Amino acid sequence: MALKSFNPITPSLRELVQVDRTSLWKGRPFKALTKGISKTGGRNNQGRITSWQRGGGHKRLYRVIDFKRNKLDISAIVERIEYDPNRTAFIALIKYEDGEHAYILAPQKLVVGDKIISSKDADIKIGNCLPLRYIPIGTTLHNVEMKVGKGGQIARSAGTSVDLVGKDSGYAQIKLKSGEFRLVPLDCMATIGTVSNPDQKNINLGKAGRNRWLGWRPHVRGVAMNPVDHPHGGGEGKTSGGRHPVTPWGFPTKGKKTRKNKRTSKFIIKKRK
């Protein structure tokens, strides 16, 4: 997909850069694979704000994506490639030989009419899904499971992928885009290829209102608040905070490591950069 810029006939169009989506499906989503999704506005079940700067945004339909790809040894045809407002990647509607439909993450270079399959005997071809045990070292993958049967969790965002760099003692070694090397059980499923829409990282929203459409509210700096609202607040005139950057609750931020899950640290061979 190419990027699209605009003539500056309005101020917001001057900086606007979008992904050209003219080749995507222009109709409604497949109704049987959609369901309603309610907005939280950043509030939890007690009505308290747990995620700042969230709220509003355009109403969305949730597309049910098959991250497990566990319909084995039945080939499917790609019927169309669609936009999904709930994620940065594009999605593909596929139809199996038995008539069942499903949405999957669309990898790059997958086109309408392609035939894909989930099977341990599948060819190493874009869109096919196999257990890591049967994938050759050096293959580029996405939608990789971390637990057998749980569904893909690694490399699902636009333009992302992982590299299979080794196999040993029942585990596959994968290299993530972050530079992290990780162990994953060999029976976990993974899909061949890189996730679609790699130009997502180059877009420019052009105006604040476009962020509001996506459900993001203004981000207020701590130094612009009062002392009652933030540790950086207050002071006479414009002050720079006077301490190392912290969250509204006083915890160090901007680079402070927050990973707490020591239980799975044994699966990380090399930490991310």
Curated annotation (Swiss-Prot):
One of its GO terms (molecular function) is transferase activity. PROSITE patterns: RIBOSOMAL_L2. It comes from the Bacteria. Disulfide bonds: none annotated. Residues 254-273 have a biased composition (Basic residues). GO terms for biological process: translation. InterPro entries: NA-bd_OB-fold, Rib_uL2_dom2, Ribosomal_uL2, Ribosomal_uL2_bac/org-type, Ribosomal_uL2_C, Ribosomal_uL2_CS, Ribosomal_uL2_dom3, Ribosomal_uL2_RNA-bd_dom. Keywords: Ribonucleoprotein, Ribosomal protein, RNA-binding, rRNA-binding. The keyword Nucleotide-binding does not apply. Residues 228-273 are annotated as: Disordered. The keyword Glycoprotein does not apply. GO terms for cellular component: large ribosomal subunit. Belongs to the universal ribosomal protein uL2 family. Part of the 50S ribosomal subunit. Forms a bridge to the 30S subunit in the 70S ribosome. One of the primary rRNA binding proteins. Required for association of the 30S and 50S subunits to form the 70S ribosome, for tRNA binding and peptide bond formation. It has been suggested to have peptidyltransferase activity; this is somewhat controversial. Makes several contacts with the 16S rRNA in the 70S ribosome. HAMAP family: Ribosomal_uL2_B (MF_01320_B). This is Large ribosomal subunit protein uL2. It comes from Rickettsia bellii (strain OSU 85-389).
